A protein has these predicted regions:
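Transmembrane helix-loop-helix
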Residues: 1, 80-138
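Intramembrane alpha-helical segments
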Residues: 1-22
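Hydrophobic alpha-helical transmembrane segments of polytopic
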Residues: 12, 34-37, 74-81, 85, ...
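Helix-coil boundary and interhelical linker segments in multi-pass alpha-helical membrane proteins
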Residues: 15-38, 88-105, 151-157
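Solvent-exposed interhelical
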Residues: 40-96
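Final/C-terminal transmembrane alpha-helix of multipass membrane proteins
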Residues: 134-155
Length: 157
């Protein structure tokens, strides 16, 4: 079902939240923010895979894309969730997420990384080529890894 990614995004976003809760014994705004960062990231990531590998998914009887096809509505949703993934990731800079914080250097790094994610999503939106879906998938993996490292190093330094 096209709902598979949405349903899977919920347990897929738990690890960061659970890590925070295990370390602090508190389900606070920090844990919720980490959950939302991971939750919104999953849509462009998995839908880009579904886009690029749509023939294989169709042969297996899976409908990965939200509309069931590679169309403007699907690519617009990918772009929408990419923007939200970035926006949620910069919220800690504004000091409203408790102990989860970002310095000016951290937020600038995430904005730059986020620009790559959004640009990759926009490229897919413009032309719908599998090549751009593959680039977005790779960009999404790099984005998530580097924002996690940004939060880690920003806290250390």
């Amino acid at each position: 079902s096209p709902l598979a990614v949405f349903i899977g995004a919920i347990p897929g976003a738990f690890p960061f939240m659970i890590g925070w809760v295990a370390a602090t014994n508190d389900i606070g705004i920090e844990a919720i923010t980490l959950f939302l960062m991971q939750f919104f990231w999953q849509f462009p990531h998995f839908w880009s895979i579904g886009w690029a590998q749509s023939i294989d998914y169709e042969k297996a009887g899976f409908k990965m894309l939200p509309t069931g096809k590679k169309d403007k509505s699907t690519s617009a949703q990918i772009l929408f969730y990419s923007v939200w993934a970035v926006l949620i990731s910069i919220v800690p800079y504004f000091g409203i997420t408790g102990e989860l914080k970002l310095s000016i250097f951290g937020v600038l790094a995430i904005i730059i990384l986020g620009a790559f994610l959004i640009f990759s999503s926009y490229a897919l939106f413009l032309d719908g080529k599998n090549e751009n879906a593959n680039k977005l998938m790779l960009t999404s993996v790099i984005y998530l890894t580097l924002i996690q490292l940004t939060f880690l190093f920003d806290k250390i330094f």
